[in-house]
Amino acid sequence: MSKVYDWFEERLEIQAIADDITSKYVPPHVNIFYCLGGITLTCFLVQVATGFAMTFYYRPTVTEAFASVQYIMTEANFGWLIRSVHRWSASMMVLMMILHVFRVYLTGGFKKPRELTWVTGVVLAVLTASFGVTGYSLPRDQIGYWAVKIVTGVPDAIPVIGSPLVELLRGSASVGQSTLTRFYSLHTFVLPLVSAVFMLIHFLMIRKQGISGPL
């Protein structure tokens, strides 16, 4: 085993990387509220894992979506648990994200030189809300249908470009198969990928600049 480790150590300097991570200075004013961002990340990882598991059974069609969710909840092994954890961690992620934003704002963590860290955090907050909107429509039940119809209909009030925006979001004039396909693609591929990129940027900047000092 040591020979395998030595082989990787010689090429990648694993120990130096580990020492850099574990020896990072943590200011004495840091408390449990500074963990809210990490908890949000943990919820995101739980979302990815449970969401991936459900893709094996979920069918993104208007005729089969609701039935496939019922199958997950009643027939698939531990499906009820996986979907419940997905739902609970989604709510927890939103809550932790909101508390994290408040903590950063109240402690002045958005000030110079951390403006870009704040901007990426705001982008991540918008992405989190987008997860909620797109995921809400996937069961294709009455609540999800009308929620999506209302949300996608909001841009219709914008002069000139309102109607084209609505059609772009829905894929057609009304909420249907095109809408479900769009939201499923956004929820399972586009949003997770974009979120992962912004999270990486966010964490690299925090790593570079360190934790903000007390007020």
Swiss-Prot record:
CDD domains: Cytochrome_b_N (cd00284). InterPro entries: Cyt_b/b6_N (IPR005797), Cyt_B6_PetB (IPR023530), Cytb/b6-like_sf (IPR027387), Cytochrome_b_N_euk/bac (IPR048259), Di-haem_cyt_TM (IPR016174). Its cofactor is heme b; heme c. One of its GO terms (cellular component) is chloroplast thylakoid membrane. The keyword Disulfide bond does not apply. Heme c binds at residue 35. Belongs to the cytochrome b family. PetB subfamily. This is Cytochrome b6. GO terms for biological process: photosynthesis; respiratory electron transport chain. The 4 large subunits of the cytochrome b6-f complex are cytochrome b6, subunit IV (17 kDa polypeptide, PetD), cytochrome f and the Rieske protein, while the 4 small subunits are PetG, PetL, PetM and PetN. The complex functions as a dimer. PROSITE patterns: CYTB_NTER. Heme b 1 binds at residues 100, 202. It comes from Pelargonium hortorum. Heme 1 (or BH or b566) is high-potential and absorbs at about 566 nm, and heme 2 (or BL or b562) is low-potential and absorbs at about 562 nm. Binds 2 heme b groups non-covalently with two histidine residues as axial ligands. Binds one heme group covalently by a single cysteine link with no axial amino acid ligand. This heme was named heme ci. Keywords: Chloroplast, Electron transport, Heme, Iron, Membrane, Metal-binding, Photosynthesis, Plastid, Thylakoid, Transmembrane, Transmembrane helix, Transport. NCBIfam families: PRK03735.1 (NF002990). Component of the cytochrome b6-f complex, which mediates electron transfer between photosystem II (PSII) and photosystem I (PSI), cyclic electron flow around PSI, and state transitions. The chain crosses the membrane at residues 32-52, 90-110, 116-136, 186-206. One of its GO terms (molecular function) is metal ion binding. Heme b 2 binds at residues 86, 187. It holds the Pfam family Cytochrome_B. It is found in: Plastid, Chloroplast thylakoid membrane. It is a multi-pass membrane protein.
